[in-house]
Amino acid sequence: MQVILLEKVVNLGNLGEVVKVKDGYARNFLIPQRKARRATAAAVAEFEVKRAELEKIAAEKLAASQAQGEKLTGQTVQITQKSGVDGRLFGSVTNSDIAEALTKQGFAVEKAQVRLPTGPLKVAGDHVVAVALHTDVVVDVTITVIGDHA
């Protein structure tokens, strides 16, 4: 199925590009999330009319994400978790725990934006975690997991 992208989609294309994707990907993800529309002649003409408005919205989102990224760069977040004497945690620190801690510090971050490539943090200490604020803005944040030997 051919679709027109209404915003930048990672590993697919940029705003306004007409790309060919599998039917299920378009029907179940891109179209319901309003990231794309079917590429009919009428839809292409309608998109060209709205292109400037959509590009302006995309630029505003990028600028807001970059501003938040500058504030977030170099931040350190401390999370306390119960642990054993060897530093291994009882349980783990997940992306939702990190997002919650960042929100308490005044940064609007959702758990889906926190990237933990090796999975949840299971050891006390300092960990560098990526936070994807936008498809083009990824910031590294230091998470200090403090083991509570209670």
Curated annotation (Swiss-Prot):
Family: Belongs to the bacterial ribosomal protein bL9 family.
Protein name: Large ribosomal subunit protein bL9
Organism ancestry: Bacteria, Pseudomonadati, Pseudomonadota, Betaproteobacteria, Burkholderiales
UniProt source species: Janthinobacterium sp. (strain Marseille) (Minibacterium massiliensis)
InterPro entries in the cross-refs: Ribosomal_bL9 (IPR000244), Ribosomal_bL9/RNase_H1_N (IPR009027), Ribosomal_bL9_bac/chp (IPR020594), Ribosomal_bL9_C (IPR020069), Ribosomal_bL9_C_sf (IPR036791), Ribosomal_bL9_N (IPR020070), Ribosomal_bL9_N_sf (IPR036935)
Function, in words: Binds to the 23S rRNA.
HAMAP family documented for this protein: Ribosomal_bL9
GO molecular function terms attached to this record: rRNA binding; structural constituent of ribosome
Gene3D superfamilies: Ribosomal protein L9, C-terminal domain, Ribosomal protein L9, N-terminal domain
Pfam families: Ribosomal_L9_C, Ribosomal_L9_N
Assigned keywords, A-Z: Ribonucleoprotein, Ribosomal protein, RNA-binding, rRNA-binding
Keyword Endoplasmic reticulum (UniProt): no
Gene Ontology cellular component annotations, sorted alphabetically: ribonucleoprotein complex; ribosome
Record GO biological process: translation
Top-level lineage group: Bacteria
Tagged with keyword Lyase: no
